[in-house]
């Protein structure tokens, strides 16, 4: 209870300082709107239909890109974690591609797919791929070798059976940590994917900023924060259910 009260107090102080800065003229309100300006801007966006349209588009990009990126990342991470030959084969490919930031792929996404939904999905998928890949690879590699030897002694000689019975359950906590990190990273990638003209929250933020409608920009920033909070809460619940055997 004490921690909750402190958290609420900290939030109230933050909001109060935020409101005071533009009201006292320390910063032009057109550059930094106070919290009191956000609800009217939100209601205006909802009434115009722009908010719902943007949220729907971004959720479509987010879910598709996240699914593609995490699916490939988990699959390849598990394979390279299980087999030394696969890790060796991909070692230099990983070293070359890993340092390239997701934003660097934007020009290629536009060239290959145009300013379109596939381009946004590609950028988001690239943005989360490496996080999940290394999480899965590291989690599989960290599995106790004694467990693998015991599995082989009990007849689990095929890679698929070892994966199903030993490796995946043991590596699940590490993989899920990577997936949770990817949830937040994907929202960052959504903005990068949409600021170049693809319909969604990022595009709407850029349109608003070009008109100095900073209150609208904040509306969409908070919308992303709220959506991430919902996804993260749902994922933590799912994670607890999947790992209930550890309790």
Locate predicted features.
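Loop-to-helix entry region at the N-terminal start of transmembrane alpha-helices
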Residues: 53-61, 111-131, 171, 176, ...
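Transmembrane alpha-helical segments of polytopic membrane transport and secretion proteins
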Residues: 1-12, 233-247
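Cytoplasmic-entry segments and transmembrane alpha-helices of multi-pass inner-membrane transporters
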Residues: 75-111, 134-143, 149
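Hydrophobic alpha-helical transmembrane segments of multipass integral membrane proteins
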Residues: 5, 9, 13-17, 52, ...
